[in-house]
Amino acid sequence: MKLSGGVEWALHCCVVLTTATEPVPAARLALLHDVSPSYLAKQMQALSRAGLVASVQGKTGGYALTRPAAEITVLDVVQAVDGAGPAFVCTEIRQRGPLGTPPQECTKPCGVARVMYAADSAWRASLRSVTIADLVDSVEQDNGPTALPAIGAWLNPAGSGS
């Protein structure tokens, strides 16, 4: 399974948006993470299309989470950025070639497909079981209780409007 880099960026943005008191422009999120503003903007647009963040227009505009962090799963973010399609798509290779199995004998998925479908299901269940709130907790455990408040203050400096 290979996820795009945008998934990592989007997850980090969702975590830090939990600290913001006002909408945060994508450019400010990109500056915080030292990443490409245009590429990050695409990830934020994907989150917005999925309804995970709201895009607020105007001088004090930016992005904000649309619901509590405990209600947004890692799977929600992965699917918003990389799509909801399956990780494995069976192409029935067993039916090809000079010794291929006749299609009428292929009435159920083969062992390869079954194990891949099971792995995809387990992977999705694992990502579904972790929320942005859980990731916030992990940041606090890994970096201490002042890390996220400091980020929140940097994202929304008092009186700046952004």
Task: Give the predicted meaning of each segment.
Residues 90-162:
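C-terminal regulatory/oligomerization modules of transcriptional regulators
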Residues 38:
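Key DNA-contact positions within bacterial/archaeal DNA-binding proteins
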Residues 14, 44-45:
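Short, hydrophobic-biased segments on the C-terminal half of alpha helices
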Residues 51-66:
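Beta-hairpin "wing" of winged helix-turn-helix
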Residues 31, 48-49:
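Alpha-helical residues within the helix-turn-helix
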Residues 3-7, 11-35, 54:
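N-terminal helix-turn-helix DNA-binding core of bacterial DNA-binding proteins
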